[in-house]
Amino acid sequence: MRLLTVGGKVVSVGGKAIEIPDSSGGVYQIAAETRAGASVSATKGTTTVSGTADTSGICTLTLYEPGEWSVTAVLGANTRTETVLVGTQNVDLMLFKDAFAENDWETIIAVCQSGSIPSTWAVGDSKTMTINDTDYQIDIIGKSHDNYADGSGKAPLTFQMHDCYKTLYQMNSNNSNNGGWNNCDMRTTHLPAIMALMPTAVQSAIREVSKKTSIGNRSSTIETTADKLFLLSEIEIFDGPLFSFDGEGKRYDYYTSRTLRTKYLNGTAQSWWQRSPYKSYGDDFCRVDGEGYEGYIDPNTELGVAFAFCF
């Protein structure tokens, strides 16, 4: 229900519009975009109009006076106010905390989906996510780095696990890199199983991005896959490819030092998989070792997994 206050009198606006013209004779609207369930109010002098954002996060307020209105959205402890000059126009009232870690994942998802990321959210910022009863630190590793697979533009943020997932996995049980990233067990079996354990809101919001990887078996041919959860390639972690072919992307801004490439499992430094097939053999994939250096190993070896994703 919306409440309209005109000249100090409150009028309910329910299932149909009630128009109360003032001396200016105008009827105007503000369409406020915010979070679902947020309380939205517009105030000008002694006149206030209020409403609640629908499930899509839109609250349309009907006003009866032009001019400058103060529009406020409130949801829990979050409040944001913007001043708008009313004819009919939209106002963005996306609610978020300036400190990335202080936002819940639903808010982070909503901000990413809006396409407008606050400047205070920086590469290297992190937030905890609970997956299958275990808490993991999730880092921002890039901004506007990955392309959406549907061609609709760039993902505002790319996220990756700060350390390794609690279970070690083989890259390919057949001990081959033939078929590359596209056909390996990690991509077709293990990562989908992990994704099914992530928070429901996160699962629903993760979008496919385009990842480039060689097809394996010593071939320099690069193919593009559409991935929700993915592993990083060698060039996305290091300054240049040493054991993989050119063309598998570019380095994420996060990976500026060997220390940042070192990941842990239960407090111990752990080697972790890359998606890059080793260019000189038909039976190895690339890895990052426990000291943060590049390397390669048989794909039926169980190593750490630090997957990435975008909203």
Please report, for each region that a protein language model flagged, where it lies by residue.
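N-terminal low-complexity, intrinsically disordered "leader/linker" segments enriched in small/polar
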Residues: 1-27
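Collagenous Gly-X-Y triple-helix signature in extracellular proteins
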Residues: 92-311
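Short Pro-Gly-centered beta-turn/loop motif in secreted/extracellular proteins
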Residues: 59-70, 76
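Short, acidic Ser/Thr/Gly-rich low-complexity loop/linker segments typical of extracellular
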Residues: 44-63
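Structured interaction patches on ligand/partner-binding surfaces of diverse proteins
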Residues: 74-93
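Structural motif
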Residues: 24-43
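Short beta-strand/loop motifs in extracellular/secreted proteins, especially
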Residues: 2, 36-40, 67-69
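Extracellular/surface recognition and adhesion modules
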Residues: 32, 57, 71-73, 140
